[in-house]
């Protein structure tokens, strides 16, 4: 009997592969899309800036004028004590939240909603931003960091500016232990060992006097879980 593959262990859901969500500061999303934001604006004050484990960007605790508190992603240049505005009549300034339809073309935005009121789904990593490309009747086109242009409802909210925490990838990890701790906060198993580098007991591609597959890489979709590695139910393999 061989040992279980990493995909089988992950499916079992042991602590190694389970996201440590109990360490999170809380949900990071916009306040509910109420009449106060639809008709005007509401002011909020940044009372604290926090580090959220497993998140690449810092988060801010914002207290609004109605004493409601929220965790939000902050842009570069915001500090404790500054005020932000949320609503259709908010000023075009980094940190302010407006519907996409009210943001001029060419302005960088982040934490974009895909459905009005969902709290923000797109462009949330540190240092990321998207651009408002154009407006049309009933739609706004936004260019995402990947280069893909997405058509969205103009009522979807977004934050003006660039997410704080940019440049994080420029500093090397240097030590393997630092990378291990960084990725363990996101429940990512690291390092990732190749199957051909394993022993025969650990992987179907393991063993042998040199590193090679030793068998076809294509497998049936209905094969047993312990053998389901490589190109699963592939129509074709190799270069085109």
From Swiss-Prot:
Residues 13-28, 224-240 have a biased composition (Basic residues). Residues 1-11 have a biased composition (Polar residues). It holds the Pfam family Ribosomal_L2_C. Belongs to the universal ribosomal protein uL2 family. The keyword Ribonucleoprotein applies. SMART domains: Ribosomal_L2, Ribosomal_L2_C. InterPro entries: NA-bd_OB-fold, Rib_uL2_dom2, Ribosomal_uL2, Ribosomal_uL2_arc_euk, Ribosomal_uL2_C, Ribosomal_uL2_CS, Ribosomal_uL2_dom3, Ribosomal_uL2_RNA-bd_dom. One of its GO terms (molecular function) is structural constituent of ribosome. The lineage of its organism: Archaea, Methanobacteriati, Methanobacteriota, Methanomada group, Methanococci. NCBIfam families: PRK09612.1 (NF007180). Part of the 50S ribosomal subunit. Forms a bridge to the 30S subunit in the 70S ribosome. One of its GO terms (cellular component) is cytosolic large ribosomal subunit. This is Large ribosomal subunit protein uL2. Keywords: Ribonucleoprotein, Ribosomal protein, RNA-binding, rRNA-binding. One of the primary rRNA binding proteins. Required for association of the 30S and 50S subunits to form the 70S ribosome, for tRNA binding and peptide bond formation. It has been suggested to have peptidyltransferase activity; this is somewhat controversial. Makes several contacts with the 16S rRNA in the 70S ribosome.
């Amino acid at each position: 009997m061989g040992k279980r593959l990493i995909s089988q262990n992950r499916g079992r859901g042991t602590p190694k592969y389970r996201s440590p969500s109990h360490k999170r500061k809380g949900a990071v999303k916009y306040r509910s899309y109420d009449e106060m934001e639809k008709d005007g604006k509401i002011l909020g004050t940044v009372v604290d800036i926090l580090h959220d484990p497993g998140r690449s960007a810092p988060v801010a605790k914002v207290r609004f004028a109605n004493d409601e508190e929220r965790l939000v992603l902050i842009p570069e240049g915001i500090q404790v004590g500054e005020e932000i505005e949320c609503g259709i009549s908010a000023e075009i300034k980094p940190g302010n939240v407006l519907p996409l339809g009210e943001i001029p073309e060419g302005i960088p935005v982040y934490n974009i909603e895909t459905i009005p009121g969902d709290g923000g789904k797109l462009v949330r990593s540190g240092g990321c931003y998207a651009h408002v490309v154009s407006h049309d009747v009933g739609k706004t086109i936004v260019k995402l960091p990947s280069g893909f242009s997405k058509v969205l409802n103009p009522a979807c909210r977004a934050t003006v500016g660039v997410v704080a925490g940019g440049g994080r990838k420029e500093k090397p990890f240097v030590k393997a232990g630092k990378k291990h701790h960084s990725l363990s906060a996101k429940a990512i198993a690291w390092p990732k060992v190749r199957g051909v580098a394993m022993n025969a007991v650990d992987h179907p591609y393991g063993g042998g006097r040199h590193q090679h597959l030793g068998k076809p890489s294509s497998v049936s979709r209905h094969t047993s879980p312990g053998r389901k590695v490589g190109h699963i139910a592939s129509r074709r393999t190799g270069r085109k």
